[in-house]
Amino acid sequence: MPELPEVETSRRGIEPHLVGATILHAVVRNGRLRWPVSEEIYRLSDQPVLSVQRRAKYLLLELPEGWIIIHLGMSGSLRILPEELPPEKHDHVDLVMSNGKVLRYTDPRRFGAWLWTKELEGHNVLTHLGPEPLSDDFNGEYLHQKCAKKKTAIKPWLMDNKLVVGVGNIYASESLFAAGIHPDRLASSLSLAECELLARVIKAVLLRSIEQGGTTLKDFLQSDGKPGYFAQELQVYGRKGEPCRVCGTPIVATKHAQRATFYCRQCQK
């Protein structure tokens, strides 16, 4: 599933082609996504794009009459293409732009979303979200406070959007490795110093992935069709049985809440 770096990479890739241009119309080939594509999107016509923003894993396209909310789901990606390029099997939604380009949404598993709202504030998919991990609001003191009474393992807690948004399976595993923290540790057992370190490395790992265009394991593509190259720098995720790049110990894979977790039993305590 695309996580924060992949969504932010998509935002940065499509923004220059959308802001200042006008959506002439939308083409919805298959509206049966995780939720049905909102009827308002079918009727889009002559709507200038004012901004392209991101909140958590949602892309937010600001138009004069409202907002398009896009979630990439498990396998979605957005590409900027020439209008004349014919669609392929899993190309479900196009926004045809006034500059001769098209924003094309591809999603083999159809678990993403294209929603419409007049107002962002109070929309059900955006409520109850924690702070952005790259913001000043997410820091060691905040993390320590939220972990203090949490009797659950730190790995699934990091993936809870109420704690912090956008840190999914890949980046939780990678960040815990970078901080030297075992994923099975109780959140409440982390000291303030450990939380400060963990908050710092989460930011560093996410920023590095954004620099590399995110992580492509299967379906994700950047807006120009290129894969995300952070996959080449993964330290533990997807490396079960391979030697740790630091100590040589074989990487271990377990499951938390049906999600794969990768770690080094020597480097993470």
From Swiss-Prot:
Swapping E6Q leads to an effect described as:
Decrease of glycosylase activity; no effect on AP lyase activity
> Which E.C. number(s) belong to this protein?
3.2.2.23, 4.2.99.18
Q: Which SUPFAM superfamilies match?
A: Glucocorticoid receptor-like (DNA-binding domain) (SSF57716), N-terminal domain of MutM-like DNA repair proteins (SSF81624), S13-like H2TH domain (SSF46946)
Enumerate the active-site residues: P2 (schiff-base intermediate with dna), E3 (proton donor), K57 (proton donor), R259 (proton donor)
Q: Which GO terms describe its cellular component?
A: cytoplasm
Cofactor list: Zn(2+)
Instruction: Give UniProt keywords alphabetically.
Output: DNA damage, DNA repair, DNA-binding, Glycosidase, Hydrolase, Lyase, Metal-binding, Multifunctional enzyme, Zinc, Zinc-finger
Q: Name one GO biological process term.
A: base-excision repair
PROSITE patterns hit by this protein: FPG_CAT, ZF_FPG_1, ZF_FPG_2
Q: How is its cofactor bound, per UniProt?
A: Binds 1 zinc ion per subunit.
**Record carries keyword Lyase:** yes
Task: Report which reactions are catalysed by this protein.
Answer: Hydrolysis of DNA containing ring-opened 7-methylguanine residues, releasing 2,6-diamino-4-hydroxy-5-(N-methyl)formamidopyrimidine; 2'-deoxyribonucleotide-(2'-deoxyribose 5'-phosphate)-2'-deoxyribonucleotide-DNA = a 3'-end 2'-deoxyribonucleotide-(2,3-dehydro-2,3-deoxyribose 5'-phosphate)-DNA + a 5'-end 5'-phospho-2'-deoxyribonucleoside-DNA + H(+)
Domain free text: The zinc-finger is necessary for DNA binding.
Xref: PANTHER family:
FORMAMIDOPYRIMIDINE-DNA GLYCOSYLASE
HAMAP family xrefs: Fapy_DNA_glycosyl
For this chain, the family text in UniProt reads: Belongs to the FPG family.
Identify this protein by name.
Formamidopyrimidine-DNA glycosylase
Organism from which the protein derives: Escherichia coli (strain K12)
Q: What is the lineage of its organism?
A: Bacteria, Pseudomonadati, Pseudomonadota, Gammaproteobacteria, Enterobacterales
